[in-house]
Amino acid sequence: MKIYLVGGAVRDALLEQPAGDRDWVVVGADQAQMEAQGFKPVGKDFPVFLHPRSGEEYALARTERKSGRGYRGFVVDADPSVTLEEDLLRRDFTINAIARDEETGELFDPYNGARDLQARVLRHVGPAFVEDPVRVLRAARFMARLAPLGFTLAADTAALMREMAASGELDSLVPERVWQELRRALSCAQPSAFLRTLHDADALRVILPEVDALYGVPQRAEFHPEVDTGIHQEMVSDMAARLAPGDALVGFAALTHDLGKALTPPEEWPRHVMHEQRGVAPLQALCERLKVPQDFRQLAIIACREHLNVHRLAELRDRTLHELLVRCDAFRRPERIAQLALVCEADKRGRLGSEEAAYPQGEALKRLHAAALAINARDLAAEGLQGPQIGEALTKARIAAIAAARRIGA
């Protein structure tokens, strides 16, 4: 019985990057032996155990044979005779197929993952890559994480991904897994690499058709020197990751704020009048399909509808700005205003030549919201107002507070 550290922990150590959870593989053991040593079985589909003290996951070495469509269609063999090399062969990428002996620290690298780490290449381990559609998503997500370190996708891996997209294999992806990988990608430093990798593989049209439809749609060059809305979307996603590192909530709203531009009739290009309203329906469809959590949905819809209003904040009347705050539910959910400001700043700076531009609208929005938020119903009730009178007086007082804050900030 031999134990090896495998996967991301080994990879990240070699990259000198912070490591997450540690995963272990056990060679030459069966379930009875593991339980005899105090390990607790937890795997439903695979022979996985929790260490009795550390709680870390230990999996028996296994092979997987394709038996059906999708990522669940596999027959697993975890016989004690399965070798470490056979176990590593089933893994997705060479950089994840490196093992380290728990006792000696020696690396076991039969598929040259260390060489690919050195060359900064993301490459599939073997032909079985095409058997699991989730690996297309994982390739894109790893690129979102590793592209800032100089990684590129191996040409043969990119070719396999295109084959998988063309074969219809991606149709078997379950919504929950798509959302999981998208959310993780939006938490990475370069989400554009996720989008670009999938788009180049012709997989984005299957996974996120609402986003894929933005590519090739022109915008006015005086406002968008990058012209292509798809490229703008990539830049906005990266800017959101820069402004709010690791914040997938802001990242998702940034990703989906311009979906309406794909619905602009071509004869109206490059203008996109009312795209902020047109974008709500495809955004809601995307959220329904992927079962997106409510907090993500709500902020994304707010950003989609309101980003142009925030851009022209100085032009809004005090009452109009108050109405915007009400639509954002900003008096019950005050955190939304800072989030909305970040999305709008990412939109404004996610353009060629504007990456370092100032965005005073964001700070102004937060300041005016804070002034309105300082007015509360309890104070008005203490003055003897009751029922509808309180609501009317509260609105009037908050609008007055916005006006006063504007005069001070002018």
UniProtKB/Swiss-Prot annotation:
Please give the positions of the paired cysteines in each disulfide bond. none
A GO molecular-function descriptor: CCA tRNA nucleotidyltransferase activity
Q: Which UniProt keywords apply?
A: ATP-binding, Hydrolase, Magnesium, Metal-binding, Multifunctional enzyme, Nickel, Nucleotide-binding, Nucleotidyltransferase, RNA repair, RNA-binding, Transferase, tRNA processing
Q: Which residues bind ATP?
A: 8, 11, 91, 138, 141
- A Pfam family cross-referenced in the UniProt record is PolyA_pol_RNAbd
Which reaction(s) are listed as its catalytic activity? Answer: a tRNA precursor + 2 CTP + ATP = a tRNA with a 3' CCA end + 3 diphosphate; a tRNA with a 3' CCA end + 2 CTP + ATP = a tRNA with a 3' CCACCA end + 3 diphosphate
Residues holding CTP: 8, 11, 91, 138, 141
Q: What is its EC number?
A: 2.7.7.72, 3.1.3.-, 3.1.4.-
Q: Which GO terms describe its biological process?
A: RNA repair; tRNA 3'-terminal CCA addition
The answer to keyword Transport applying to this record is no
Q: Which cofactors is this protein said to need? A: Mg(2+); Ni(2+)
The record describes how the cofactor is bound as: Magnesium is required for nucleotidyltransferase activity.
Q: Which residues form the HD domain?
A: 229-347
Residues at which Mg(2+) binds: 21, 23
Q: Which InterPro entries match?
A: CCA_bact, HD_domain, NT_sf, PolA_pol_head_dom, PolyA_RNA-bd, tRNA_CCA-adding_enzyme
**Miscellaneous comment in the UniProt entry for this protein:** A single active site specifically recognizes both ATP and CTP and is responsible for their addition.
Record's subunit section: Monomer. Can also form homodimers and oligomers.
Q: Which NCBIfam families match?
A: PRK10885.1
Q: What is known of its domains?
A: Comprises two domains: an N-terminal domain containing the nucleotidyltransferase activity and a C-terminal HD domain associated with both phosphodiesterase and phosphatase activities.
Q: What does this protein do?
A: Catalyzes the addition and repair of the essential 3'-terminal CCA sequence in tRNAs without using a nucleic acid template. Adds these three nucleotides in the order of C, C, and A to the tRNA nucleotide-73, using CTP and ATP as substrates and producing inorganic pyrophosphate. tRNA 3'-terminal CCA addition is required both for tRNA processing and repair. Also involved in tRNA surveillance by mediating tandem CCA addition to generate a CCACCA at the 3' terminus of unstable tRNAs. While stable tRNAs receive only 3'-terminal CCA, unstable tRNAs are marked with CCACCA and rapidly degraded.
Give the protein family: Belongs to the tRNA nucleotidyltransferase/poly(A) polymerase family. Bacterial CCA-adding enzyme type 1 subfamily.
What is the designated name of this protein?
Answer: Multifunctional CCA protein
Name the species this protein comes from. Xanthomonas euvesicatoria pv. vesicatoria (strain 85-10)
Gene behind this protein: cca
